[in-house]
């Protein structure tokens, strides 16, 4: 195998795209990953990193351009994330996202994977302005200018996103105005080295009603109407007081400028961690404590901290596909794991005997219960906690599920939940995935107990390498093999350790597109 040196320039042809959207070329049997390069292109690249089995390079020049290459519309495109694919025509983005699923299956090889039906990705007509929520870090530059945006991938460089084209225009307008108000009222802004103040701002807008809710995350207490929150146990020093965020003028100016704002909250997060939120949240302004959103044929309420899909338009497509895959029957007893505010469960509640959901976020379960009441769904029951703890209790109390919906975070299903599912397998199951790699990994276990009927890819995030998928699973008459979960857990821990050791750093939890 050829030895490549850092800084070495070479010419190669791009053969395919990798799971993160990068182009992949091969030189003397060695894989080279090049962000922003497309299949079929002849490119000049410069080697930036060498690992044992592959190299990474940056694109220097496109010698022969792909007919599928288009000019990115977003001026901050190359700074935001190397997994963006705005340079690829949209029809080919959809095909790429189906291929990403194929690559993940080929890597993990769950039982029968070659015969899985991979359906064409369901895309959008308008691929800009689709993100209903932003969660931007805030920083003050040396000249006093306040910017808001996201960290450049793998760095602590904050990219100023003052005109992000995939963001809902109203949320973008509001965050830009917030930055100007912070400057105007000289409010303290967080600096991870020495200064406390505002560190993150979340703005979410309902696509159904236009209502807006905002969360300010601060590392220091706030002052509103002369009151300090959170309450302090001892008198603060003068230096500490100077870092307190005086919210009176900001709150008045913001709510007067934007009549769409119905909720403003503050979250106190004093610790120096990469977690976005702290444990305590206080409502500052509440014309309404929730916003009203809609999906399929019903409406529901969302608290500021509750989870909901970032793309409201495609959420209709995603949840519609989930309902279709479940094929609900009147005698079905459904478990909605990772239920959030209950959105998928509500879509089937009137067609089944019962829906039992759980989530670890208290705000989400509160919203789920209130939404169920408002919708008149008396057959819905929700609990706070982990599925692997709650499901066995439900089984003991007589609620043995015949159908299950899982919609886990990007980390996939917890091993304990996988074990619980295999001990109490429902007759049918729908897996809604936001990470094809962890989906394929989970199918290694699930495919022993369930037949994969099909996988339907849904494009929730146009112009990024991310995709979501709905998997229809039907219980097998007999398991293909018995899975030893103690070995599975050891293997995954070893894999995670090796990945972390190879990267040489802890993964960033700050948001990126």
Curated annotation (Swiss-Prot):
Binding positions for S-adenosyl-L-methionine per the UniProt entry: 309, 338, 359, 407
Keywords: Methyltransferase, S-adenosyl-L-methionine, Transferase
E.C. numbers: 2.1.1.-
InterPro entries found in the cross-reference section: MeTrfase_TrmA_AS, MeTrfase_TrmA_CS, NA-bd_OB-fold, SAM-dependent_MTases_sf, TRAM_dom, U5_MeTrfase_fam
One family name in Pfam for this protein: TRAM
Active site (record annotation): 434 (nucleophile)
Name the record gives this protein: Uncharacterized RNA methyltransferase YwfF
Origin organism lineage: Bacteria, Bacillati, Bacillota, Bacilli, Lactobacillales
């Amino acid at each position: 195998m050829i030895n490549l040196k850092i800084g070495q320039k070479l010419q190669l042809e791009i053969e395919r795209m990798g799971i993160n959207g990068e182009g992949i070329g091969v030189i003397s049997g060695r894989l080279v990953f090049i962000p922003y390069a497309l299949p079929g292109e002849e490119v000049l690249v410069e080697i930036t990193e060498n690992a044992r089995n592959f190299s990474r390079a940056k694109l220097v020049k496109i010698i022969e351009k792909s007919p599928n290459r288009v000019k990115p519309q977003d001026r901050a495109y190359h700074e935001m994330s190397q997994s963006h694919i705005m340079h690829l025509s949209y029809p080919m983005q959809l095909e790429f996202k189906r291929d990403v699923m194929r690559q993940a299956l080929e890597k993990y090889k769950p039982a029968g994977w070659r015969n899985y039906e991979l359906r064409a990705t369901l895309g959008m007509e308008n691929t800009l302005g689709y993100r209903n929520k932003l969660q931007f870090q805030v920083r003050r530059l040396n000249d006093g200018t306040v910017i808001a945006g996201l960290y450049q991938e793998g760095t602590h460089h904050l990219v100023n996103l003052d005109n992000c084209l995939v963001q809902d225009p109203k949320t973008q307008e509001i965050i830009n105005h917030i930055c100007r108000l912070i400057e105007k009222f000289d409010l303290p802004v967080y600096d991870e080295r020495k200064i406390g103040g505002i560190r993150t701002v979340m703005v979410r807008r309902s696509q159904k009603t236009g209502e807006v809710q905002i969360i300010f995350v601060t590392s220091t207490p706030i002052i509103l109407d002369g009151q300090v929150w959170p309450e302090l146990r001892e008198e603060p020093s003068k230096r500490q007081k100077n870092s307190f965020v005086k919210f009176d003028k900001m709150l008045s100016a913001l709510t007067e400028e934007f009549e769409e704002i119905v909720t403003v909250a503050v979250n106190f997060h004093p610790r120096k961690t990469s977690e976005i939120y702290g444990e305590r949240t206080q409502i500052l302004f509440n014309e309404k404590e929730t916003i009203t959103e809609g999906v399929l044929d019903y409406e529901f309420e969302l608290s500021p901290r509750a989870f909901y899909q970032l793309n409201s338009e495609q959420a209709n497509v995603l949840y519609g596909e989930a309902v279709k895959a479940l094929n609900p029957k009147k005698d079905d007893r459904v478990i909605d794991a990772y239920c959030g505010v209950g959105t998928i469960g509500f879509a089937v509640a009137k067609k089944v005997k019962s829906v039992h959901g759980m989530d670890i976020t208290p705000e989400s379960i509160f919203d789920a219960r209130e939404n169920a009441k408002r919708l008149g769904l008396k057959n819905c029951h929700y609990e706070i906690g982990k599925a692997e703890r709650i499901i066995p209790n439900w089984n003991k109390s007589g609620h043995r599920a015949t159908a299950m919906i899982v919609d886990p975070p990007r980390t996939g299903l917890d091993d304990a939940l996988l074990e619980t599912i295999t001990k109490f397998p429902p007759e049918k199951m729908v897996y809604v995935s936001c990470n094809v790699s962890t989906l394929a990994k989970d199918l290694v276990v699930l495919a022993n107990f369930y037949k994969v009927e099909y996988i339907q890819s849904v494009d929730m995030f146009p112009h990024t390498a991310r995709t979501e998928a709905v998997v229809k699973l039907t219980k097998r008459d007999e398991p293909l093999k018995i899975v030893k979960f103690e070995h599975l857990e050891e293997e995954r821990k070893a894999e995670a350790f090796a990945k972390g050791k190879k990267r040489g750093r802890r993964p960033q939890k700050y948001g990126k597109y």
